[in-house]
Amino acid sequence: MPTEQNTNLIPASGFSQLATFQMEDMAEELNGLEGGFDRIKIPSGGMTVFEMPGETEDSPETVKEFSAVILYHHPILQYYREKYTGGSNPPDCGSYDGVTGVGTPGGSCAKCPLAQFGSGENNGKACKSRRRVFLLREGELFPMILSLPTGSLREFSRYIKRLLSKGRKSN
């Protein structure tokens, strides 16, 4: 006589418990630690590879290309009174929404003379437009940040428009 088989491998409630367990573990591990998201460095100055965070800060991984999912993206505006030479020094004025600048001069970005063409080097803008993209790579739990420079914004805009024209969002 055939016996009835139980096809329930894991009760549905087990998944939420597993997720809670993982979140609790992460919260415990991160308790008291500081730091933001790891950053992906875009090729510059003749380089042809991206610099990805490695196991340690001294051993980054270099790749020609990588795959990731866009979780979120937003505009950033940055104005440096002196020419920016890299490093982690904050801009004299910056905006994380592309609307309101914080710092000197601060205020409405749309009305700011530093956000107009002709205010910067080679008739460009003194206040540079960038795009911060939060990416999640396969096998990772935390997003990474890719900060797109002004020269990459046109192609990123085209990509987003292609997605939208197909009825899809980037995230």
Locate each region found by the language model.
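OB-fold ssDNA-binding interfaces and closely related basic DNA-contact patches used
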Residues: M1-L141
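Extended serine/threonine-enriched, polar tracts that run as long, contiguous segments within proteins
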Residues: K128-N171
